[in-house]
Regions:
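Accessory terminal regions of nucleic-acid processing enzymes
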Residues: 1-242
Length: 242
């Protein structure tokens, strides 16, 4: 397939994903059952979703309802279910937060299997069972900004147009909460360009012109030009050092 043909197919496919505000709101409403919704699976299949920045587990999903109840008891407010939210400007980006509160908050819940029997949060930290967060100077939980969970929640806030995220780590013995602010500069400087390149050059070509499915060989999937160029440059540098 020529580059021109591939580019035209990319543009047509992106256009097919675009929805007006009414369409985006309708999908969010229809997909609040998440994994139990056929529409949820269909609409997210061809999009890059923020959950891909994290690692979901069966244990975590099964424990989420319990964590939501714990959060509601702590905050004294209702956590509402949320369907698939599609980005207004980039229709191939989407998110499904674990919950939303009013107009300003998303909720992201982690129930790591590794801490299921930890008596306290501090014990889990000291035993190095929670590698994605640490204790800050005030002794409170703090999500590491270089961890993919941080990218996930920033993506959730941006796509859903909310200012804050309640990041919750829950076990049967304790619940820890961190209120994370939306960081527009982090999104602009660390995320959006990389997400666009990954989708347009890695994911989208495989969606519209699958190579892996023909012979089920990973070698059939061609790396994007910029990656091939970087590999070539790196190899040249190694050769020059010999």
């Amino acid at each position: 397939m020529s580059k021109e043909t591939l580019q035209k197919l990319k543009e047509d496919f992106i256009s097919s994903l675009r929805l007006d505000r009414s369409g985006r709101l309708n999908i969010e409403t229809l997909t609040r059952q998440q994994a139990n919704s056929q529409i949820w699976h269909s609409e997210r299949r061809n999009r890059l979703t923020t959950s891909n920045f994290g690692r979901a587990t069966d244990y975590g999903k099964a424990t989420e309802p319990e964590a939501i109840v714990a959060l509601e008891n702590i905050l004294k407010c209702k956590v509402n279910p949320c369907g698939l939210i599609i980005d207004e400007h980039f229709p191939y980006l989407a998110t499904t937060p674990d919950g939303i509160i009013d107009e300003d908050f998303v909720v992201e819940i982690k129930c790591p299997f590794a801490v299921r029997d930890s008596i306290t949060f501090l014990e889990a930290i000291n035993c190095k069972k929670l590698l994605f967060c640490r204790l800050n100077d005030n002794g409170a939980m703090e999500l590491k900004i270089d961890h993919h969970y941080y990218y996930q929640v920033q993506g959730q806030m941006h796509i859903s147009k909310r200012k804050f995220c309640y990041f919750v780590v829950h076990s049967k013995n304790w619940t820890e909460i961190q209120l994370i602010n939306y960081d527009e500069s982090f999104w602009d400087n660390k995320m959006i360009d990389k997400l666009k390149i990954f989708y347009m050059e890695c994911l989208l070509p495989e969606i519209i012109n699958p190579q892996y499915g023909k012979r089920l060989l990973v070698d059939d999937i061609k790396d994007p030009e910029h990656i091939l160029e970087n590999i070539k440059t790196k190899n040249n540098m190694k050769n020059n050092l010999k």
